[in-house]
A protein has these predicted regions:
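Alpha/beta enzyme core
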Residues: 2-200
């Protein structure tokens, strides 16, 4: 099995997948040596390692370069933070092809405006549900390997509230994305409610 098939199997289990964050080859190697099953290339961590804030300043090319270094260093499946896809649906086609080309197992795409902000900062804005659906449809159509996972992330919790975040996540799931990421739930109750309210 290749790393994409491994990740799909891990996501299909009925148990939690812990994928610690990394930002370069060394930090990814530490995740692997600690015995985890996958690693997450964090956009925020990449930005901080470059000495800049996570407010959309890191380019796709810089993220791709860092992701390629990580993929070359470890055998773990790598989930890469692709921010907003670096633009609209047209940009997202290239984003998917580039991340797929370098061998990451999955990317997640968020529904913030471009340029985006770290999901834990105030002042975030999200695009319309319709625009995000078009972006996700473009991403799904652009991949050439069906095992390359597309994860849809919503930052609507901190903008419009929990119910809107769930409504968006349910819409994303209906499009056929491989996983859903509801950013920044504000309680254990919300965390538990997310999988109950979003269909498999």
């Amino acid at each position: 099995m290749n790393s994409r098939q491994v990740l799909k199997r891990l996501l299909g289990r009925d148990e939690l997948l812990v994928a610690p964050g990394c930002f370069d080859g060394l930090s990814a190697r530490l995740v692997e040596e600690a015995g985890f099953d996958a690693a997450y290339l964090s956009g925020g961590a990449v930005a901080r390692s470059m000495g800049i804030p996570d407010i959309g300043l890191v380019t796709m090319s810089e993220t791709i370069e860092r992701a390629a270094q990580v993929v070359a260093t470890v055998k773990l499946p790598i989930i890469a933070d692709a921010d907003t896809g670096y633009g609209n649906a047209v940009n997202l086609v290239r984003t998917v092809r580039e991340f797929e080309r370098i061998g990451v197992a999955a990317i997640h795409i968020e529904d913030q405006i471009t340029p985006k902000r770290c999901g834990h900062l105030d002042g975030k804005e999200v695009i319309s549900l319709g625009e995000m659906e078009k972006k996700l449809e473009a991403a799904l159509a652009a991949r050439t390997d069906s095992d390359f996972c597309i994860i849809a992330r919503t930052d609507a919790r901190g903008v419009h509230g929990f119910d809107d975040a769930i409504a968006r996540a349910r819409s994303f799931a209906k499009l056929g994305v491989d996983a859903i990421f509801v950013e920044a739930p504000q309680s254990e109750q919300e965390l538990a409610e997310i999988p109950r309210r979003i269909p498999d």
